[in-house]
Amino acid sequence: MRASAIVLAMLAMAIPAAAETVQLYAAGSLKAALTDVAKAYEAMTGNKIDAKYGPSGILKNEISAGAAANVFASANMEHPQALHDEKKSGPVFRFARNQLCALVKPDLAVDSLTLLDRMLDPNIKLATSTPESDPSGDYAFEVFHKAQAIKPGAQSALEKKALQLTGGADSASPPSGRTVYGWHVAQGRADIFLTYCTNALAAQKEDSRQQIVALPEKLAVGAEYGLTVINGGPPSAQRFADFILSSEAGKILTSHGFSPGSINSNLEASNETQRAQPAQGKNC
């Protein structure tokens, strides 16, 4: 906590004479949480955060191709690590965790014990995001891999039937103010949608009839979120990244359903321009 207090104090003292704009590229699942984090940072520093949200894999490819991003917050560790390996960014830090849940249409009888059978039912429309483009899809396919150990043949069956409704370059967008996952379920395009628990909670706020079913322990898959600062950006980019890693921002992330990552791991070191060792994350 002492490190976080030091960083918050230094952020307050480091307000530039002219406000700077930080270009944030971030996973779509972080939109609500990082919007609130950005508002807190803007109020503290006077700087502006210009954010673009979308599938982490697509954003990573855009940054790799030269997009003008300053900070990249991904729904996995692999994509920011790839940018670091390309020498396009600094170290990668884990700053939040999530879990996969099943968002289920209102009238479907299902619980954690019967979830796998329901997903395998040929009459049930099972949806995921798009693997490689969106880590949520990669995590969902990891669930399918785990299912193979429970029921031989399950992995192939689930992969073949899964409808990749989100996270692709041409995926349909919901109306303004709707979450894409809840929208697809409401429109009847998915009976069960494997997505982040935070996304499922947001969908349920829009339609309280939609169900959230926890994955059974043998199918459970966690998500780790990685943060990196793109080389060549303004000093305020590093300060904003440090704020995301602070306990103050951690409280905001927690309020949106995320679990803490390695918060405060690098704060004092960054103030002395000696970065802490990056966290080791799980590839998708």
Tell me what each language-model feature is.
Residues 14-19:
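N-terminal signal peptide c-region/cleavage motif recognized by signal peptidases
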Residues 20-67, 74-77, 81-85, 94-98, ...:
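Exported/periplasmic ABC-transporter solute-binding proteins
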